Amino acid sequence: MRMRSVASVLALAACLPPAATGQSLDQRIAAVLDAPAAKRASWGILAVRVADGAVLYERNARVPMTPASNTKLVSTALALVRLGPEYRFVTRVLAPDAPDEQGRLRGDLRLVGGGDPTLSGRVVPYSKDAKEGDPLGPLAELADRVVLRGVRVIDGDIVGDATRWPWEPHPAGWAVGDMTWEYGAPVSALTVNDSAVRLSVRPGKAEGEPAAVEFLPPLEPFTVHNTLRTRAGAERRIEVARAPGSSVLEIRGVAPPGGGAAVQWVAVPDPAQFAAEAFALLLRQRGVVIRGRARSLARAPGAPWSEPQGVELARRESPPLAELARIVNKVSQNLHAEMLLRETAHVVRGEGTARAGVEEMAALLKEAGAEEKEFDLEDGSGLSRRGLLSAASLTALLRHMEARGLGELFRSLLPVAGDDGTLSGRFRGVADAAAIRAKTGSLAHVAALSGYAGDDPARRVAFSILVNGYTAPNAEVRALADRIAVEILRESQR
């Protein structure tokens, strides 16, 4: 089939004529699914009225399918239900004792991670127009407070303490290729700048000159093997590679002289070590002498946990959990979803493991009335290829949040169609698109869209659209899912 551009597909979706008068929702959705791209895919769809559960449309609604990032609906709902919307994550700086009269601190200075995903330049609360600030800004605030406590010399090490959760960096089912990049960053209770750095690779200005490599924040979390060649007349080809868990970053390829930098966001292998090095840098910039080194402290799976003790020199509380969940769902932030899940498991079960978190997700789905045979999850973000959810499970969850009195809040955390988050570029030309609030999901051959349609609470519809196994362009399949969502919205307005 002839490939279509993303723009043309979206324009096609926006310019469709309104539903024919008198046609049922079944007939209107059937017309959408008659498209060639739809026929070569597996669809799981359910639309139910939130108020009474009346089924408006269903197709393979109880078949477990790969949900991709629609999994985040479950992990964020779980955090809100178990921890509460006002829950805050705390990062502390501890020392064995207070500094002496000369400002000397004897022993190690410990930066204790509390699972806060906001130790970065990201703006909270979420704003679609916000520009990110200093990636080390929150750590700088902690460093300032340490200096205000009179610390001038540290005889020991700077320790990045990530022992709140066991060190299990990646959930089951994550692709090895994802682990190199920011969206597949390792999960740690001490996370700074989303455990990633901005890598900039700029070819030399003349034949034979080496490429310049820069990191932001300005740290050196990798041993760089740079074999990129600058060659006149060459076609630009710059490759970046890192084996999972390795601190060796390979930069290779060829590029003509000059030209702009190639930019990638690369995950760091040891988030707590990265945090310790960043904190040491900030303290030194403020004139603090550090006799020791920066190092990380982790807890092996199965090892017991005890709350770190010491004199608290500084602390930082995160914004409320609801605002963190908003970021997860609006921009589909994988690492943050996993962090919310681990912290929920830590608080509820006393073990911040992926498995304990997944078991809590299953418990919530069963509380919502979902059938156990219709879901099987492996992570909190949906990056795992092993996760399964049915459309019925997701709509049950969406209705359950309403029943718990969290419906309006949960709905507000989702992308607004045609306006923000991962739906900012979709539903163009639909006048009342903002009445659709939904979470997107995307993996290779997987598309998902689940959420709410309609502004009137009495007529609002919870829906889930899961698409698996397609070979058509992603934009074409998403446009079909969007058309179905619009038809569901129209039904809610009748």
For the regions a language model picked out, list residue spans one by one.
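Positively charged n-region of N-terminal signal peptides that target proteins for export
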Residues: 1-5
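Bacterial N-terminal signal peptides
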Residues: 7-17
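Conserved serine DD-peptidase/penicillin-binding transpeptidase domain
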Residues: 23-35, 81-373, 456-457, 479-483, ...
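A short, well-structured edge-of-sheet supersecondary motif
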Residues: 34-59, 295
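Small-residue-rich helix-loop
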Residues: 42, 56-58, 146, 331, ...
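Residue-level preference for non-acidic, small/hydrophobic
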Residues: 53, 72-79, 158, 190, ...
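Short active-site loop at a secondary-structure junction
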Residues: 58-78, 325
